[in-house]
Design a protein with these regions (language model features):
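N-terminal secretory signal peptides that target proteins for export/translocation
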Residues: 1-4
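Acidic, metal/ion-coordinating pockets
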Residues: 21-284, 303-317, 321, 327, ...
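Short conserved micro-motifs at the rims of enzyme active sites and ligand-binding pockets
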Residues: 269-272, 339-341, 371-374, 396-397, ...
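Low-complexity, glycine/alanine/valine/leucine- and proline-rich hydrophobic stretches
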Residues: 397-421, 442
């Protein structure tokens, strides 16, 4: 038994009064959440190959995932989550709930992954054209009927990219369960919620439905289980560094005791079968990252305090991609400069590791000036003069379009920025006040890569688009 040789973290026992003399049955559930594409191992922790070994040794009756499976690593993002589903199939998952992360590549990709899965993907409250998503699944484990119901966070409608959730609607979790429970209650001995919702919603569910004795949720922290009334709420941390284990004890078909804990994957021997599955994906990924897009004839510097080579290149790339009059990107978005020599796909990824997308909108001149007066930005299509001795918000001395025309307060201009700034990043409320807003779904780094490939030869360029008054 794996528990005899692998350290168990945070083992917690919740017990009700034992039914002496009654027939006792144990159902073991293992669970994960927030994998986010982390199928490859990190230094001595995590990775699907280690998880496969644990699952093989423990031999759980049910293997479940509470969502946030796909986006978050290159190997998953490049193949739209396909490697994740393939290893989950091999490990032997029985069901997974649908989280916001599963919509990262759009509903068509989600539908494809759901078709590839050898297990049901569940959401009782997310309505979409994807027929492959189920409300619930019922399993027979040790002659105990276990109903597993999936729930998705309503936050999906706020945080999901508009083009990815255009045809999706997420209902309230409590009202949804009020409708779903009567349909499964008579068909199950035990109801388990597999949720990708907030902690507050988990507690609401536990208080509203005390007959639900176990909620398997999705939270980043590796934390102690929570008890709300008779309901136990568990999760297993992020990136597959731990796997959760729940032991349900039934006496004469009634749930009597719940034991739950986390098992770290550190030190577990990887399963060669999973490593073999991932090898071709790794090879294709490495080949893609080695692709040469262009050549830099000199070093391209990065700066958040003044005009920079990489900032100019990025802003010009963004504006070229969308065709707007102006591009405004936070100067801290590029995480690195570019050294003289070949520029590869890996170089672009190092410059822009985030998943930010391009958003177009129309802003009036007064809004643009307020943005420009706060701090230095990477910009294109506009030239500014700043006085950094003034307080933040009052630093703008002048702002003109590229042709020298002054930006007028009441005129409207087409602008491209990124979704980070539109959703309030760095405190720029003006971007959230734009009109004709469209999230293009185009990754900022893809726009940069395409622009570099089009140029072929990249010159470090400072042209005075940001100047400082003396």
């Amino acid at each position: 038994m794996i528990l005899s040789r692998v350290r168990v973290l945070l083992l917690v026992l919740f017990t009700t009064v034992a039914l002496y003399g009654a027939s006792e049955t144990h159902v073991v559930i293992m669970h994960t959440n927030d994998i986010r594409g982390h199928v490859l191992p990190e230094p001595d922790a995590g990775g699907s190959a280690r998880l496969a070994t644990l699952v093989r040794d423990v031999k759980p009756d049910l293997m479940l995932d509470a969502g946030e499976m796909f986006s978050g690593t290159l190997i998953s993002d490049l193949f739209l989550g396909a490697p994740v589903i393939q290893v989950m199939n091999t490990i032997g998952y029985d069901a997974a709930s649908v989280g916001a992360n599963e919509f990262s590549f759009g509903i068509h990709a989600l539908a494809a992954r759901a078709r590839e899965a050898n297990f049901p993907m569940l959401s009782a409250n997310a309505e979409s054209p994807i027929g492959e998503i189920q409300v619930a699944a019922i399993f027979n484990a040790q002659d105990v009927r276990i109903a597993v119901i999936g729930l998705t966070s309503e936050e999906l409608m706020r945080t999901g990219r508009p083009q990815n959730v255009k045809y999706v609607d997420v209902a309230d979790v409590v009202s949804t369960l009020e409708t779903v429970l009567p349909r499964v209650r008579g068909r199950a001995d035990c109801i388990v919620l597999l949720t990708n919702v907030s902690r507050a919603d988990e507690r609401r569910l536990a208080r509203a439905f005390p007959e639900v004795r176990l909620i398997i949720g999705a939270h980043d922290d590796a934390e102690l289980p929570v008890r709300v009334g008779a309901t136990t709420i568990v999760s297993a941390g992020k990136f597959g560094k731990y796997v959760g284990k729940v032991d349900l004890t039934f006496n004469d078909g009634k749930l009597n005791r719940i034991e739950s804990g986390l098992i770290p994957l550190e030190g577990v021997q990887p399963d060669p079968a999973i490593e073999k599955i991932l090898e071709p994906y790794e090879a294709k990924l490495n080949k893609a990252l080695q692709q040469v897009l262009g050549h830099a004839v000199g070093d391209l510097s990065r700066s958040t305090a003044q005009e920079s080579h990489i900032g100019n290149l990025l802003a010009d790339a963004v504006r070229a991609k969308t065709g707007t009059a102006i591009a405004l990107i936070n100067a801290a978005d590029p995480q690195a400069g570019i050294r003289k020599g070949p520029i590869t796909s890996r170089t672009v990824l190092e410059v822009l590791p985030s998943e930010n997308t391009l958003v177009t909108m129309r802003l009036n001149g007064a809004q643009i000036k307020r943005i420009l007066g706060r701090t230095v930005m990477s910009l294109s299509g506009v030239r500014v003069k700043l006085d950094v001795t003034k307080p933040e918000g009052k630093r703008l001395v002048s702002a003109r379009l590229q042709d020298g025309t002054p930006i007028r307060d009441k005129d409207f201009y087409s602008v491209t920025t990124n979704d980070y700034l539109v959703t309030g990043g760095d405190g720029y409320k003006e971007f959230s006040e734009g009109i004709s807003v469209e999230d293009t779904g185009i990754l900022v780094r893809d726009a940069l890569g395409e622009y570099i490939a089009r140029l072929g030869v990249v010159q470090p360029r400072l042209d005075g688009r940001i100047q400082f008054s003396r």
